[in-house]
């Protein structure tokens, strides 16, 4: 049962009352015919009485058949209503999923753009790193050459001083 079981019971009782009140005219007509038959008694033509009995039986059967068909129609209408609600729910779910897919596709595009931008930045930075590494090697070589030259000059000066000391001394 659903959460609103009281409402379900009331709805079913109302449906039953509606069905009974709708068919009450048939029951009243049958009752009237029955009373007329009792009043007339057994007088009259037996063939007519038999025909009336047969017609009353046929009318009763048709009334029962109409009631069954009405019940089936009501049941089918309820099933149709449930099916329509289910379809609507699934359509809403499908629309929500489509929107979610669109949003995710946009997010994927953004991420792809960011990845591409990062790859470009990485390439630029690697190029800059290569240039700076080359420049650093050049500067280190120049510095080493200069230090080596200064060391050689100091060695030459020391040798000169040494040789001057030896000759003067």
Curated annotation (Swiss-Prot):
InterPro entries tied to this protein: Autophagy-rel_prot_16_dom
Coiled coil regions, renumbered to chain: 47-164
A Pfam family assignment: ATG16
Any one of the GO CC terms: phagophore assembly site membrane
Keywords linked to the UniProt accession: Autophagy, Coiled coil, Membrane, Protein transport, Transport
Superkingdom to which the source organism belongs: Eukaryota
Membership in a protein family: Belongs to the ATG16 family.
Binding partners and assembly: Homodimer. Part of the ATG5-ATG12/ATG16 complex. Several units of each may be present in this complex.
Name of this protein: Autophagy-related protein 16
Species of the source: Meyerozyma guilliermondii (strain ATCC 6260 / CBS 566 / DSM 6381 / JCM 1539 / NBRC 10279 / NRRL Y-324)
């Amino acid at each position: 049962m659903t959460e609103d079981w009281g409402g379900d019971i009331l709805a079913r009782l109302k449906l039953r009352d509606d069905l009974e009140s709708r068919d009450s005219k048939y029951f009243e007509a049958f009752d009237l015919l029955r009373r007329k038959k009792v009043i007339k008694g057994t007088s009259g033509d037996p063939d007519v009485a038999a025909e009336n009995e047969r017609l009353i039986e046929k009318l009763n059967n048709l009334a029962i058949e109409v009631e069954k068909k009405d019940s089936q129609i009501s049941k089918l209408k309820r099933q149709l209503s449930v099916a329509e609600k289910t379809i609507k729910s699934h359509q809403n779910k499908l629309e929500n999923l489509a929107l979610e897919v669109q949003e995710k596709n946009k997010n994927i595009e953004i991420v792809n753009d960011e990845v591409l931008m990062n790859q470009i930045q990485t390439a630029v930075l690697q190029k800059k790193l290569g240039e700076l590494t080359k420049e650093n090697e050049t500067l280190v070589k120049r510095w080493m050459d200069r230090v080596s030259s200064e060391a050689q000059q100091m060695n030459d000066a020391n040798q000169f001083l040494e040789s001057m000391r030896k000759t003067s001394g």
